[in-house]
Amino acid sequence: MKSAEIREAFLGFFEEQGHTRVASSSLIPGNDPTLLFTNAGMNQFKDCFLGQEKRAYTRAVTSQKCVRAGGKHNDLENVGYTARHHTFFEMLGNFSFGDYFKRDAITYAWTFLTSEKWLNLPKEKLWVTVYATDDEAYDIWTKEIGVPAERMVRIGDNKGAPYASDNFWTMGDTGPCGPCSEIFFDHGPEIWGGPPGSPEEDGDRYIEIWNNVFMQFNRTADGVLHPLPAPSVDTGMGLERVSAVLQHVHSNYEIDLFQSLLAASAKAIGCSNDNQASLKVVADHIRSCGFLIADGVLPSNEGRGYVLRRIIRRACRHGNKLGAKGSFFYQIVAALVAEMGSAFPELVQQQSHIERVLKGEEEQFAKTLEQGLKILEQDLADLKGTVVPGEVVFKLYDTYGFPMDLTGDIARERNLTLDEAGFEREMDAQRVRARSASSFGMDYNSLVKVDVATQFTGYSATTGSASVVALYKEGQSVSHLNEGEEGVVILDITPFYAESGGQIGDSGFLQAGDARFDVSDTTKTGGAFLHHGVVASGSLSVGAQVETQVADEVRDATKLNHSATHLLHAALRQVLGEHVQQKGSLVDSQRLRFDFSHFEAIKAEQLRALEDIVNAEIRKNTEVMTEETDIDTAKKKGAMALFGEKYGDSVRVLSMGGEFSVELCGGIHASRTGDIALFKIVSEGGVAAGVRRIEAVTGAAALAWLNSAEDQLKEAATLVKGNRDNLLDKLTAVIERNRLLEKQLEQLQAKAASAAGDDLSSAALDVKGVKVLATRLDGQDGKALLALVDQLKNKLGRAVILLGSVHEDKVVLVAGVTKDLTGQLKAGDLMKQAAAAVGGKGGGRPDMAQGGGVDAGALDSALALAVPFVEQGI
């Protein structure tokens, strides 16, 4: 069976069993702020399982698209090198929300897998696991389904804690949970590996193909499991894995779905279609990239966009490794659409968009990849040892745009590892430099000298026609810019707004026949507007006629935020006083940032008042008025001017809400205040002495922020078994209970220390008439060790004591010397030696000292220093 046939068979089978076919949700989780990407079929049903959402059906079946790259579930570094790791995969799943339970779920799974009508897998090839104490599931499998006991495996708590098992599923530390039952397929003795639960279980012979999760408990904060009133079922079967089984292959990359993508990848790259890891990387990555872009993710330097960029660049690097010349990755999109478009129509609808995004990102990366690879090869040739230094990894990241995992791929091919800690140190240092940077960097704008006054038409237009007046590359005038080159374009007329007054410059593109210049930013020097960007295709020359196009969506969102800053400024003067002056701002399409003079933190009630005032003006939906006048007339009308801003003879006065807000401003704004829709403050804090900062969102971004806050509130209420009305009371009770438990724990630890003291005193050695006790008590904190040393000094008399512990991944040390010995031996001196041995520091009084370190493996050696310390000191 082909993969598409298996997908449809699964959906059809469960429809026959009364399930509602539900479309795959977006890869961008719509109801879970804790997830970077959708990574399981149950994600879209989370609220159903929690009882917070009721749907028209109680049985559902889906084929869910999933991505695991970045965050907790990150398979990126393994992709291409193993048979089953992917950045994108399909999860077939059937779900019951308080409807059927174990018996039906198990019966459905077995019927679909083994019935001649459906997959017709040989029963003798299937193994089943259950949670160790789930006798109900075990009996159903053995007594009703007929799976022999020798192919049944009970899996206990194999992860070091109660209910921490491969066969016990939890949504979190609290909440719905329950045992699960996994079905494995035996690929045969020619493949290495053992059954689940055996020492060889990590081999490839026995592969899990289906997991049935039985949500029958609710785990409370105290760890107790309480039966759910309406148990549910959540199952998942990887389409790629079951396709491999049915197509009699042992690697997911050998299934029909991947064979077409591998062939298309090889064709686009111009290489042979053989079993190369790099080709598998490309074929895998086109799926995750295509689906992510179709769902609205774009390459960027943060969040989901950065993960997408990493995947694209990893694919490009592996393509180049196989000999790709020029852009190739975007060419594989057509094969992806042909293979999966019928099941996921968004691929068909977004095909051209996906191709444009991939081509643009690939071209941008290609400009620096070759040079970066040469630098890396040079550094690796000079490398001594097997660890690539953090500064090398950072240089590639910072200068050439190499994500760390891309450098890691190259290093792994040479059996090298990365100094990740060193990389993080370099990143921290860069952040410090960025905060302190001012005007010391190279400013190519200052090198642009052109006697041109660009005519600005952007107040009323976002498109137009213009002539190229001048071109600059790295600050030097040039006659043309070729494809792939970055530069600055100056036009005689433009709708692009140049960065000013805190509003970012416009982005978009310039088109001249086959030539296209992508504008990433617009600035101004003198009267000239500088369009910064890169030639995406063709060649652009001075004198060329171009069509201009501002990015409308970015412009629209930015102007709403800009108008909101004016309303906020006026509201601040109302609430805080007339002393408030704007000290700076940054307005882009995502949010607004407003710095202002004020002498203290703003109180919560003042923040609420600010929001109320601004939103009241928004609801009035008054027209935003502009007027060109001279500076003196504007000031007489009460227009506020920015401190330190230079104004010409003619100024633009912007009024909102009549006289509510009147300011001098040359920026782009909303037509009416109602266009802003909603205003929400998301943060307030100090940035300098006497300067405060407010960050806020508007419109759709504000609504998204409120929805996220509501989701988090619901999550918090669920964790404490409360609701919105009693959440504070519940949290107060939890905090008080925790305080009491901590007090009880301290008392128990004191008792345990006392008992331990009795046992330990007999282990002391006699060294030159001094009792010496040096031992480790892992798990004890410093407070407990101090109490124990005090007790031991009383018990032992003339003594030197050194106790150590590994507590929360750190070494804790306490040393004690009885007072009759402090003239000869000092606890602080002993502690300095012991702490240094574990990579730390320590010190204290002559009779008592504390210290610690990070090298737990050296703790025993540190404790061994006590005896020679006494021998040398007496």
Curated annotation (Swiss-Prot):
Pfam families: DHHA1, tRNA-synt_2c, tRNA_SAD. GO terms for biological process: alanyl-tRNA aminoacylation; negative regulation of DNA-templated transcription. Disulfide bonds: none annotated. Zn(2+) binds at residues 562, 566, 665, 669. It comes from Pseudomonas syringae pv. syringae (strain B728a). Catalyzes the attachment of alanine to tRNA(Ala) in a two-step reaction: alanine is first activated by ATP to form Ala-AMP and then transferred to the acceptor end of tRNA(Ala). Also edits incorrectly charged Ser-tRNA(Ala) and Gly-tRNA(Ala) via its editing domain. Belongs to the class-II aminoacyl-tRNA synthetase family. This is Alanine--tRNA ligase.
